């Protein structure tokens, strides 16, 4: 089996970012890199949003930036500015396309579906897929979001809603999150900070529909994209099974 100088396990945001930085900083001119990723094609599957606290190489993948936001509690809305650290939203589809197009230029970089296809014993391995036990009794941030489009102008795309707590809490922490990409397009997301043992919280579609139609008072819209996920809010247990990681 073929050997590589470097191996990146996981071709998601972290793994591809590392490979991209190695490539653009000319660290792979005389080195080989293998990326282990089970997917056979890349397409938009996530929206990554963050406060821009430093310059980065993916401004051309930013879908929208905001310098103003709101936080809502029942009967009160707080307006805040984030001029020094604007909030940015990156389209994962554009991110994947940019990085993969760059990596394809270097014949020293190869993709594999499984690590069993290569010899890793003498390689320097970066593992971006830690083993996390999916314990539903621990605290998680679990969410579901939809991108919607309206026929007429509806959203103020100069300001986003970071957290709207004016919703059913169900003895947990629950808020909605709205990113207006334009006056007719927005991401609306329901987010819970809770254990994942209450199935009643997982009615994401119903929660979002009720929020859009009865809270935002928007009746005519279409859903163009959907995403969901769960982020552990506890210290994970790592199980190292490979050497040189």
Give the location of each predicted region.
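N-terminal Rossmann-like FAD-binding beta1-loop-alpha1 element of flavoenzymes
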Residues: 4-34
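Flavin (FAD/FMN) cofactor-binding core of flavoprotein oxidoreductases
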Residues: 217-241
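Conserved small/polar residues in nucleotide/adenosyl-binding loops
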Residues: 243-245
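Conserved N-terminal helical subregion
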Residues: 65-134, 141
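Predominantly flavin-linked oxidoreductase catalytic cores and closely associated redox partners
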Residues: 109-216
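Short, well-ordered alpha-helices that flank and scaffold nucleotide-derived cofactor binding pockets
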Residues: 20, 24, 101, 180
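N-terminal FAD cofactor-binding segment of flavoenzymes
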Residues: 21-24, 34-74
């Amino acid at each position: 089996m073929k050997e590589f100088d470097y191996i990146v396990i996981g071709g998601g945001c972290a793994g591809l970012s590392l490979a991209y930085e190695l490539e653009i900083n000319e660290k792979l001119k005389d080195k080989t890199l293998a990326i282990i990723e089970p997917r056979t094609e890349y397409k938009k599957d996530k929206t990554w949003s963050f406060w821009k606290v430093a310059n980065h190489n993916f401004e051309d993948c930013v879908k929208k930036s905001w310098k103003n936001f709101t936080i809502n509690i029942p009967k009160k809305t707080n307006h805040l500015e984030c001029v020094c650290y604007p909030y940015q939203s990156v389209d994962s589809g554009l991110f994947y396309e940019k990085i993969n197009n760059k990596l394809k230029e270097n014949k020293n970089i190869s993709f594999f579906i499984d690590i069993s296809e290569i010899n890793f014993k003498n390689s320097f391995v970066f593992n971006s897929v830690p083993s996390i036990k999916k314990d539903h009794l621990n605290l998680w941030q679990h969410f579901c979001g939809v991108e919607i489009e309206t026929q007429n102008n509806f959203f103020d795309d100069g300001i986003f809603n970071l957290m709207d707590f004016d919703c059913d809490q169900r003895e947990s922490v629950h808020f909605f999150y709205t990113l207006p990409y334009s006056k007719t397009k927005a991401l609306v997301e329901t987010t819970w900070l809770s254990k994942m043992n209450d199935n009643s919280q997982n009615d994401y579609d119903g929660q979002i529909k009720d929020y859009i139609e009865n809270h935002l008072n928007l009746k005519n819209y279409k859903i163009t994209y959907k995403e969901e996920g769960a982020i552990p809010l506890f210290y994970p247990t790592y199980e190292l099974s490979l050497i040189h990681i």
